[in-house]
Regions:
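Phosphate-binding glycine-rich loop
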Residues: 1-12, 30
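Short beta->alpha connector loops at strand-helix junctions that form conserved
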Residues: 17, 36-41, 236
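Short glycine-rich anion-binding loops that position phosphate/pyrophosphate groups of nucleotides
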Residues: 20, 66-70, 100, 129, ...
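Active-site pre-lysine segment of PLP-dependent enzymes
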Residues: 28, 45-58, 70-93, 97-128
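PLP-dependent aminotransferase class I/II
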Residues: 120-197, 201-204
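Conserved PLP-binding catalytic core of the aspartate aminotransferase-like
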Residues: 186, 195-228, 245
Length: 263
């Protein structure tokens, strides 16, 4: 809906790559030019100076996914603040915080404070990740009132059913579940990072519920896991895989398969 509201054919949008594919895909549908800025290959972090250079008078949107999908990397609020300050106020910066609940490295990871500092910032959240409601399709956006009112004029009626609303309210009220989920994810994520370090596998430091890593034979490893019933995401970069952090018992099995494969 954001794309339909803001993009006119001939506009450009700026995205870091690799990134969630829907940013570019939805922009193309609306006739936008997609300007892709490669992330730092060694760390997976955004190249903010290159993002700023990619923005010009045609740019209507800059997408920031934080933590980023598929790299899992987290960008500091201060770095995002500097980005917003460096681009024209006519360009909207959308910060997708779908995975923000999984961040454990900082006490307050959200960029919410930037809404009070800049008129061209919007933040998206979802109940699909840490709250476990992917099939209910519940999300929301924090944005300046003027933009919210403008988007309301094209919003489809009945876009959120009653069952989804009730489920979201119940999930939001169960913060103990969210805390438990985040804690277990961090614990299991650390086990994978430790094994990758041991095996000399290049990976990006993740603050999400997945890890993006390079494998000597990515397709072979993915096939080995698949034979045991475990599917990982392929195709987002040649030679790399995105592994969603599994439950503890499944993680033990998958790590054994990885060890055997590497040996």
């Amino acid at each position: 809906m954001v794309n339909k509201t803001l993009i006119t054919a001939g506009d450009s949008i700026v995205v870091s790559v690799p990134a969630f594919s829907e940013y570019a895909l939805n922009g193309l549908v609306e006739g936008a030019e997609i300007r892709e800025v490669p992330a730092n290959f060694e760390t997976g972090q955004y190249d903010f100076s290159a993002l700023v250079k990619a923005v010009d008078e045609t740019t209507c949107l800059v997408w920031i996914c934080n933590p980023n999908n598929p790299t899992g990397t987290y960008e500091s609020v201060e770095d995002i603040r500097k980005l917003v300050a460096a681009i024209p106020k006519e360009t909207l910066v959308i910060i997708d915080e779908a995975y923000i609940d999984f961040v454990t490295s900082v006490a307050v990871p959200t960029s919410r404070a930037l809404l009070d500092e800049f008129p061209n910032v919007a933040i998206m959240r979802t109940f699909s990740k840490a709250y476990g409601l992917a099939n209910y399709r519940v999300g929301y956006m924090m944005t300046p009132l003027e933009l919210a009112n403008y988007m309301q004029t094209i919003r489809l009626p009945y876009n959120l059913n009653t069952l989804s609303q009730v489920a979201a309210e119940a999930a939001f009220g169960d913060q103990e579940f969210v805390a438990r989920t985040v804690s277990q994810n961090a614990e299991e994520r650390a086990k994978w990072e430790s094994l990758f370090d041991e095996l000399g596998i290049h990976y990006y430091k993740s603050e999400a519920n997945f890890i993006f890593f390079a494998a000597p034979d990515a397709e072979g490893l993915a096939d080995a896991w698949l034979k045991s019933g475990y599917q990982v995401r392929r195709g987002q970069r040649e030679g790399w895989l995105r592994l969603t952090i599994p439950m503890p018992q499944d993680g033990n099995v998958m790590r054994k398969i990885l060890r055997d494969f590497m040996n």
